[in-house]
Each structure stands twice: as C-alpha cells, then as structure tokens.
Amino acid sequence: MLKTLKNAFKIKDVRRRLFYVLLMLVVVRIGSQLPIPGVDSNYFKNWFASQSSDAFNFFDAFTGGSFTEMSILALSITPYITSSIIIQLLTIAFKTLEDMQRDGEEGRKKLTAITRYVTIGLSLFQSVAMTIGFGNKGLIPDMNFLKGVVVVSCLTAGSAMLMWIGEQITEKGVGNGISIILMINIVSRIPSDLLTLFEQFVKGKTIAKGALAALIIVAVILVVVVLVLVLNGGVRKIPVQYSKKMVGRKVMGGQSSSIPLKVNTAGVIPIIFASSLMSFPVIIMTLIGKTGGNGIGGHILKALTSNNWFNPSEPVYSIGLVVYILLVIFFAYFYTSITFNPMEVADNMKKQGGFIPGIRPGKPTQEYLEQILSYLIFIGAAGLVIVAVIPFFFNGVFGANVSFGGTSLIIVVGVVLETLKQIESRMLVRNYKGFLSE
C-alpha cells in the first residue's frame, strides 16, 4: 500500500487532488478549534458530564468534538445530513422532486440546490434553538440580543462553510467531500474514546483484570471491523449473456458479463439516516429545555436513547431498539430503490440483446433482479444492525459510553474504501497498479 501511495503521488493530477483534500481537512480541523465570540467554551463540557443521553455523544462525534468546544463549526455537517434525509423522503410524496431525481444531471443539480437551502434553514433553526435554550443558562454570559445574533450567525455560517468545503472536495479532490469531513470528524474522537475505555475498564484494575478487559475491548473492535469489511466487500454477481447478431458481415455479441450487486447495497446511508432521525428529537427537545421529565414525552425520549435499549432494569425502553432496526431496514430498501432500478436494468439488457441464463428477458428478468436484490438488501441491513447494535449492548450493560461505536466504524471504513476506489480508478487510467489489486 505504501508503494501504491508513492505511485499515486507521482501522478500530478492525483497528487494535486490529494493535497487539496488534505488542505481542506486542515482548514476544517482549524475551524473546529476557533471559539465563538462571547460563548463559554466550557459550558457544554460540564453539561455533558451531567447528561446520560447518548444523542449528544452521537451528535458530538459527527462534529468532531466541535460541539462541546462550541467552535464556529459546532453544528458541523449535521444540518446537511438532516436536509438530505428530508429531501430523500419528500421524493416519495412529491412527484416533482421524484422527476428531478430521475432527470439526470440537471435534475440532480436542482435537488442539490434545494438541499443547500434546506441546510441553511435547518442550520438557522438549530442555531436559534441552541441560543434560546442555553443562552440564559450559562452558555452565553450576560446574554443579550446582540450576543445572540453573533452566536446564531457564527453557527449558521460555519455549517454553510462546511457544506461548501464538502462540495469543493467532491469537485476538486477525491471521494465524497461531505463523507470525508464526517469521517475525519469521527476519527478525531478516537484517541479520547480509547482513553475513556482505558480509564473505565483497565486503569486501577489488577494486571490480570486489566489485561482481560483490554483483550475484550480489542477483540470487540476487531470483530466489528471484520464484519464491516465483509459487509462492504460482499458481492453477488449475476451472470449476463449477450446473444450473437450479424452487423454487416461481422458477427457481434456472444460475450459474457455480469451485474455486480453488493450485499450492502445502500452503504452506510441507512445507519446515518436512522441514527440522525432517532437523535434529532432528543437534541431539539433538550436544546429548548423540554426533556419531558417523567411524563409520556420523557419516556419517549428515553426510548429514543440507545443508552436505555439494553438496560436490564428498564426493558420497556428496548422498544427504541425495535424502531431503530425498522428504520435501518426501511432506509436500506428505500435508498437502494433510488440508486438501482431493476426495471431499467432489465430494459437496457433486452435492448442490447443481453439475458440472464435461464431467465427470459423483460419482465421475468426484472422480477428475478428484484427478488435477488430484496434478499441482498435484507442481509445487508441485518449486518448493519448487528454491527451498530454491538456497541449499544456494551454501552447499556457495561456503561462503555463512547462515541466511536459500530456506526462510526461503518462510516469510517465505508468512506475509506470508497475513496480508495476513486483513487484507484484515476490511477488505472494512467496504467498504474493500485490498492484494490494488491
């Protein structure tokens, strides 16, 4: 891999793109350390210590710790993720949006523009909610209207800037910019999470108990990583045969090919969407100071918090786990239906003289692809749930409250593999052997 990286940096275009990505990520990390004027940067550090909700841990992981530091990038790209979820869901209800989605490059540009506007709106809403909810509670000393405007402006502008940086990375760098920013934010939390695990389970224990705890932690992490790699690498290849035909005096066709269908067809999207939807109500209600107490609202918020899903003393809150699993499965099917259309694939195969051995072209081919795809989606969604739930289990039973869990590993591994594929494709154009063949 080091040799391949060396070869990649020998290619001017790839080298320029990689340096651009690194430069933008440095800007992101510097921005995450710049405090908002007039804000007590220690407020959320102390507040986090008194909270049992994991929704803010999840949120803070996505911001790379910027939220607890109350930097200008405190909201990070979470408004963009939420707006993407909203737009994707609205494509079901509004045919205009659905047509845009299927209208090629022009339609995607329009949807991207709409997503930007929704992102700014959500950033403004979250900024105002945070300022109102915590401003008079110590977040903003000597709170007044002008200070509130400054905080709201900084938070909204920071989120908009990250959205712009993500789009620039996608266009001028390698990989998906938003995903890369999300990955670097998550990775930046790994050292502190490992330190938390060490202090909680190893430090102060006897040598035998400490070694056993460390071994279990490493084993769990390795198992989750292996499961993630298997999920991302699993592919079902559907064989395709092309019939021979005469073109002038030449016989064309007769070649064999295949349709690669990934086991994890939707990637990390179902996990991000499901986790964001589960966390969003908790975050908003907490920001505006409505935690629900012991009423119905309080019980609902507890059910939405993964810390309570495996709590032996309160098993009723495991209903939240059921909702989470259903959301992951739903988004897996939903997102795959957007990115892969069996009817279009079957029609294109028929037009090109292709067929699946043993399956008639047209409608039977479409039904066959739908059947295989449905099976793969379910397996992929089940795998995603297992990987995501393992850390929830240890969190609920043993109190291992860290932000770097199964969801984070899925995101990091998925983004790294996808970025490497893009680097590989750019290198193959110039006849360089790359990562994936090694």
Q: Language-model segments: which ranges?
A:
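N-terminal cationic and glycine-rich segments that engage phosphates or anionic surfaces
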Residues: 1-101, 105-438
